[in-house]
Amino acid sequence: MVLATSLKGAHVLITGGTRGMGEAMVHQFLQEEANVSYCARTVTNTEFDEFYKTLPEGNTARAVGTAFNVASKEAIVDWVKSSAERLGRIDVIIANASPMHMEGETEHWVESFAIDVMGFVELVRAATPYLEQSPQASIIVQSSFMGREFYRSPPAAYGPCKAAQLQHVQELSHYLGPKGIRVNAISPGPILCKGGPWEKYSTLMPEWVEEQRLKIPLKRLGGPTEVANVAVFLASPLASFVTGTNVLVDGGIHVGTQF
């Protein structure tokens, strides 16, 4: 038996879709023939022109980008509305955008809460009326294994805001479940992305990165496509009885390890 995601023709919204794991998610959903609306602070709408050339003949799925700051409730509402009007439906939303602040100054807490927490909250609020009309509605938030357990000292904004996302996933799964909307989180561990923090660490602190690699049971860093594949699964009918859960994509580093 061949497992099919049945995402052809679906409409997926992804925040932070121009680089790293967000970009990989756009790629994977396009390969599944789902149409994508993505956003980032800077968008050219040429980000995926080269990728389209790799799609099989007959795959006409496309991605349309919009530039705005996810910290703006009004911008989120406008984006969701215009995206729904463009394709007449919304089936999946993925809250992926994050400032990834590993610092703990007041401005870092404020921006992290505005994007990681309230950006997720407002995206769900704006999209729910459309998701209620979908036969395969799915909400996914990109959290982190740092939202699950202690990571580092001194205290920083990133981990607690990611923990708030995980709590909200549990609340939403109970509230939206009767409406046929599934809600789940993905918590990546050390993922090596072009332009991402682990690429920077690899350049600035290669010995430290090697120490961390050896702490991972699988003895390697993850890749963005490995996270995107989980997003595709959670968005698809293959995960039709999965809601309120947090999928760790971290090579096993959460099992009793500390950085």
UniProtKB/Swiss-Prot annotation:
Keywords: Cytoplasm, NADP, Oxidoreductase. CDD domains: SDR_c. NADP(+) binds at residues 96, 125, 158, 162, 191. The active site is at 143 (proton donor), 144 (proton donor), 158 (proton acceptor), 162 (lowers pka of active site tyr). Patulin was originally used as an antibiotic and specifically trialed to be used against the common cold, but it is no longer used for that purpose since it has been shown to induce immunological, neurological and gastrointestinal effects. Genotoxic effects of patulin with dose-dependent increase in DNA strand breaks in brain, liver and kidneys have been detected in mice. However, more recently, it has been proposed that patulin might also have anti-tumor properties. Pathway: Mycotoxin biosynthesis; patulin biosynthesis. Isoepoxydon dehydrogenase; part of the gene cluster that mediates the biosynthesis of patulin, an acetate-derived tetraketide mycotoxin produced by several fungal species that shows antimicrobial properties against several bacteria. PatN catalyzes the conversion of isoepoxydon into phyllostine. The pathway begins with the synthesis of 6-methylsalicylic acid by the polyketide synthase (PKS) patK via condensation of acetate and malonate units. It is found in: Cytoplasm, Cytosol. It catalyses: isoepoxydon + NADP(+) = phyllostine + NADPH + H(+). One of its GO terms (molecular function) is oxidoreductase activity, acting on the CH-OH group of donors, NAD or NADP as acceptor. The keyword Magnesium does not apply. It comes from the Eukaryota. GO terms for cellular component: cytosol. GO terms for biological process: patulin biosynthetic process. SUPFAM superfamilies: NAD(P)-binding Rossmann-fold domains. It holds the Pfam family adh_short_C2. This is Isoepoxydon dehydrogenase patN. The keyword Cytoplasm applies. Its EC number is 1.1.1.-. It comes from Aspergillus clavatus (strain ATCC 1007 / CBS 513.65 / DSM 816 / NCTC 3887 / NRRL 1 / QM 1276 / 107). Belongs to the short-chain dehydrogenases/reductases (SDR) family.
